């Protein structure tokens, strides 16, 4: 049973049924009563798509994230959905993984659902090759696209980002001023956020008169044990480091496990700084010093931006908020 059946049985157009569903006053009382009576007789329950046929809005926002098991992204999803509910909007969540074709598939799926906007949570949706972002740019001509801690230049695209460069720069500078000289950096990816963090690390070293040593920069899967084992291997190879800064708290937990395995005292002999200030940072002994990426604030800023973007029908520029 659908809106077309109601239209046929009531002898009115689909548009009229839609106007009745949405409480449009431009329907006579007689017609309204007839449509409602037919709906009752047929046992028809309107869904959000049917209601949206006569409106410019579905009251629904699409959310995409690469990995909902990631503590940062799990938090982002929670805050986004909470904020959307406060604006009386529903959400459709798609967890895409990291494959570009899968991202494109789910992006197009959300477009087919006629959502009012699409929110891309995290920086993994902005690809290094510009042509791989074309599907987002083309879609933004029709629907607002919001990025949480990702940046893409284009019309009708709105970015809210944490200043990852400044955050890591300040953290590394503080370590150096506290006496650390051989600061190892662990990172997970070359995403928009990851590149800014890397630049912050290198710039802090240069500003403080220390060399950028490639043997102290290592990529690592976002896994606690992998981070621990990598540091153990580096130590066995004779690479000396007195502090570790990581692009994610999971890697920082691995650094703490490394220190425990080597019987190195934290923070007396060894310093560890993580990123995102997630629950993981409070689950070690001692607790990890972690940079707060302010994910809640980013998300509670993104949703009002999304709301305004399709309420006011903006689209002539890229909005860019940095915190």
Predicted regions and their residues:
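Alpha-helical recognition/docking segments in bacterial nutrient-uptake
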Residues: 56-173, 177, 235-236
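Periplasmic-binding protein-like
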Residues: 115-124, 184-186, 217, 238-248, ...
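N-terminal helix-turn-helix DNA-binding module of bacterial transcription factors
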Residues: 1-57
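Short, solvent-exposed amphipathic alpha-helices that sit
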Residues: 34, 72-86, 167-171, 193-211, ...
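Flexible loop/turn connectors
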Residues: 232-323
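Hydrophobic alpha-helical segments within soluble ligand-binding/sensing domains
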Residues: 156-185, 195, 203, 223-233, ...
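Short beta-strand segments enriched in small/hydrophobic residues
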Residues: 16-19, 53-69, 182-188
């Amino acid at each position: 049973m659908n809106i077309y059946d109601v239209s046929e049985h009531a002898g009115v157009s689909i548009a009229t049924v839609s106007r009745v569903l949405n409480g449009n006053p431009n329907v006579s009382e007689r017609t309204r009563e007839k449509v409602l009576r037919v709906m009752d007789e047929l046992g028809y329950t309107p869904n959000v798509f049917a209601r949206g046929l006569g409106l410019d809005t579905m009251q629904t926002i699409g959310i995409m994230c690469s990995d909902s098991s990631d503590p940062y992204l799990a938090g982002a999803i929670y805050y986004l959905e909470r904020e959307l509910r406060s604006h009386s909007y529903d959400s459709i969540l798609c967890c895409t993984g990291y494959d570009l074709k899968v991202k494109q598939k789910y992006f197009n799926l959300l477009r087919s659902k006629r959502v009012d906007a699409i929110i891309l949570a995290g920086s993994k949706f902005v690809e290094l090759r510009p042509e791989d972002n074309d599907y987002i740019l083309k879609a933004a001509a029709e629907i607002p696209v919001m990025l949480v801690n990702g940046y893409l230049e284009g019309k009708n695209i709105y970015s809210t980002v944490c200043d990852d460069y400044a955050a890591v720069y300040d953290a590394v500078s503080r370590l150096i001023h506290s006496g650390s000289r051989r600061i190892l950096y662990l990172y997970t990816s070359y995403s928009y956020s990851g590149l800014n963090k890397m630049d912050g690390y290198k710039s802090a070293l240069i500003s403080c008169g220390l060399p950028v040593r490639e043997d102290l920069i290592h990529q690592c899967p976002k896994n606690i044990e992998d981070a621990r084992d990598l540091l153990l291997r580096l130590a066995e190879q004779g690479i000396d480091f007195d502090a570790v800064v990581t692009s994610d708290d999971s890697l920082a937990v691995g650094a703490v496990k490394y220190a425990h395995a080597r019987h190195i005292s934290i923070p007396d002999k060894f310093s560890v700084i993580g990123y995102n200030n997630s629950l993981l940072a409070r689950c070690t002994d001692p607790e990890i010093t972690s940079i707060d990426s302010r994910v809640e604030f980013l998300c509670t800023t993104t949703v009002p931006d999304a709301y305004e973007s399709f309420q006011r029908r903006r689209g002539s520029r890229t909005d860019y908020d940095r915190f």
